């Protein structure tokens, strides 16, 4: 009955532990803002963690696998790992953006003021712009092109070659913006 034997059990246990910590510290006045920030940070950790995994681990590993004559090749990564990682990647990106927008509203800054870089909102507004560009890259450039690369949608060899370039540049742009 070890909850750590499944990812669902681990996640549920993490939520229970977080609740116990909050209660144990006597933080009975949990705020909407605090919950929004917590979800924003958690989703952001998943999103950027996967972004770094793709850029620092998976892309170089697939390149090495393709160049290893007689080796196993990248088929297992492309069939089993990449689709699951991309699922978490794109939905954590959306959740990060949505919780960030909600937090701006709850804080009283407002998403409009943030995007217009109004006084008192310029720094967080730049973050909102960077996050929006990154979200666009995930859903409009990276994911549709990864579907071609992974064979989820039909594409010619030329389309796949082009998709690899677009997905890589969008992913590298997101890595740059995340720093």
Residue ranges and their predicted role:
Residues 1-179:
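Polytopic transmembrane helical bundles with strong interfacial aromatic enrichment
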């Amino acid at each position: 009955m070890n909850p750590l034997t499944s990812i669902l059990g681990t996640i549920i246990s993490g939520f229970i532990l977080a609740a116990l910590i909050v209660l144990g510290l006597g933080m009975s006045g949990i705020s909407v803002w605090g919950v929004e920030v917590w979800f924003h940070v958690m989703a952001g950790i998943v999103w950027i963690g996967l972004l770094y995994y793709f850029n620092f681990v998976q892309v170089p590993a697939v390149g090495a696998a393709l160049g290893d004559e007689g080796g196993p090749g990248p088929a297992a990564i492309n069939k089993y790992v990449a689709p699951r990682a991309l699922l978490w990647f794109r939905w954590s990106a959306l959740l990060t953006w949505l919780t960030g927008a909600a937090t701006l509203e709850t804080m009283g800054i407002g998403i409009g003021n943030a995007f217009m870089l109004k006084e008192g909102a310029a720094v967080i507004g730049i973050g909102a712009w960077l996050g929006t560009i990154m979200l666009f890259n995930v859903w409009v450039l990276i994911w549709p092109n990864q579907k071609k690369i992974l064979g989820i949608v039909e594409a010619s060899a030329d389309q796949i070659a082009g998709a690899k370039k677009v997905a890589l540049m969008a992913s590298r742009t997101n890595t740059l913006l995340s720093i």
